[in-house]
């Protein structure tokens, strides 16, 4: 339902920038992978068909920006390029844009640079942050926050988490060059829910599957044309 809500927000005329707010590990990034998968399959409204999702790394933009205006030029170059096509910019840990790039000379930070693009609607932005950082940082800049539509992301149930990791199955298989059986996906979710405390689904289940794939890369199964991850 969070993915459906995200798509619905993007289709709005105003405040069409979804902001995913939830505890670490509840699947905020997985939602973006799910959205990309639906766009790739064409299973989205016409407004989103053919759209390209880009992830924007604020740390890389800041790296090496030593002189006044360097960061602003870099960011505007990306935003101007993205506005020329049907783009969705994903900002993980979006709270970092507050104050990012602002030097002692009083130049504009990332949030101020983004405001005109948020207003114009030429680019759709999808942000993600935790409740703590949303309250601590995002709410301090009301001009940015009110241009986003907040979507509360809760920890999924076991059944929902199984669907999420199933959606990520192709990318995990492609990366590790292994195949994950359906039973392995289900076991990763149920076992992590039962035995791993202090963390949320689906993140802890994805970690188990990723670790299993890495193990088979280091310890390949001999005399098999393809390795299978089972429980």
Positions of PLM-derived features:
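AAA+ P-loop NTPase nucleotide-binding core of proteostasis motors
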Residues: 1-231
